[in-house]
Amino acid sequence: MSTQLRAAEISDIIESRIEKFGIKAEERTEGTILNIKDGIVRVYGLRDVMFGEMVEFPENTYGLAFNLERDSVGAVVMGPYEHLEEGMTARCTGRILEVPVGEALLGRVVDGLGKPIDGKGPIDTSETSPIEKVAPGVITRKSVDTSLPTGLKSIDAMVPIGRGQRELIIGDRQTGKTAIAIDTIINQKHTGVKCIYVAIGQKQSSVAAVVRKLEEHGAMEHTIVVNASASEAAALQYLAPYAGCTMGEYFRDRGQDALIVYDDLTKQAWAYRQISLLLRRPPGREAYPGDIFYLHSRLLERAAHVNEAYVKEFTKGKVTGKTGSLTALPIIETQAGDVSAFIPTNVISITDGQIYLDVNLFNAGIRPAINAGLSVSRVGGAAQTKIIKKLIGGLRIALAQYRELEAFSQFASDLDEATRKQLEHGQRVMEILKQPQYQPLSVGEMAIIWYVVNNNYLDQVELKKVVDFERSLLSFLRDQHQDLLDEINKNPNYSEKIIEKIKAVVEEFVKTQSY
């Protein structure tokens, strides 16, 4: 005999089935592609889209909403767009662009969206972070007070860089801008500073050469390389610096120190100009859009030295008593030494100083070709290593006087003894400032070299033998007095006791060694 269900039971069964029925309703605004040209997609609809929101196209392709007009949206496609056609559907995602962050990225080469391109497999990280963030406020910042040694004598002596500073490297093409940045990254091997190198609009071969050099010198272990090469879409060249900055902020916000190199921001400005003109935004000076200053200011303001309270709040109390820093070394390429052009003046006004590389010095064999007269560090002086600060004394003034005398001596036939000595001393200082690439020096080595310069030991050395003298001195120190170098590196403060030790070692070298 079959059992019949009562009406109440039927209604209970239906109710329980409805409750168990799992369906997620997802509301998305859709639009239709009107046209595609040069990586710019115009979409009809998408009434709820936000500026900078990711827009989804068919075949897992994404774009960024840039122009919000009355009936349509102008979006820039991130990557290939040949498969997109008019009439296809575009959807809002409700998300802004995020990139992977974390320790797992160290030692890897990624593209402008954080995807690995070095053939070493996927990156083992689940953490992501938005590429656009608000820079830390004034209250959460700390003044720059800790040195970031570059290992280059001329920079650490005359234009010192501190952790959390923004120091511009500016000069014509082929004057050694990238070389300074790479040497600085190599020098962070034993400092614990994590490095991010962002290559924008460069040849693939140039980036490969940089990666190879970093690997040769054991610097790739603490470095992330972000590459948006010249062959990639303008959108990726525009986004790469922000992606690299987000990766650096991961370390800064957790009480660590990071260094980021943007090589170079001129190419990013070109990419943004291209996007803006294709979106038919009104052009301004040099055809750049009106918000080109904001492009770089919002990026470089994110480099900062943040205080303990900021780190503690960000990590929810997991990290206490530590400050974090992100130091930026943006690079700008000038045309025929014109530092008064639009982009160079913009970035000079945003940064905390600049290192100006002179093509004439470079061609004269003075490398790194730093023009001490035009280079300045506005906040790094407070962070300079104490012993170096004391030993260099009036180096800048001495060099300025030497250049003045050098110009004068070309017209004067006979010079008095004092002028001749000053000229000869200046020539020796210029020789000492020369430094081969990929050979950064420690604080201890630099301190002893500046002691030698300051106390006129070089005046007894022939001009053509100054480089040999320095090479022999460094070799002597590393072989026989490594303990003194270690002592200075560990505690780089000036004291009479340490100066006595340096004097004894230098006297021993001068008496016993040949060069």
Swiss-Prot record:
Compartments where found: Cell inner membrane
GO molecular function: ADP binding; ATP binding; proton-transporting ATP synthase activity, rotational mechanism
Pfam families, per database record: ATP-synt_ab, ATP-synt_ab_C, ATP-synt_ab_N
Lineage: superkingdom: Bacteria
Protein name: ATP synthase subunit alpha
Family per similarity comment: Belongs to the ATPase alpha/beta chains family.
Keywords, in A-Z order: ATP synthesis, ATP-binding, Cell inner membrane, Cell membrane, CF(1), Hydrogen ion transport, Ion transport, Membrane, Nucleotide-binding, Translocase, Transport
One of the GO BP terms on file: proton motive force-driven ATP synthesis
Membrane disposition: Peripheral membrane protein
Binding locations of ATP: G171, D172, R173, Q174, T175, G176, K177, T178
PANTHER family named in the record: ATP SYNTHASE SUBUNIT ALPHA, MITOCHONDRIAL
Organism whose genome encodes this protein: Coxiella burnetii (strain RSA 493 / Nine Mile phase I)
Annotated site residue numbers, Required for activity: S375
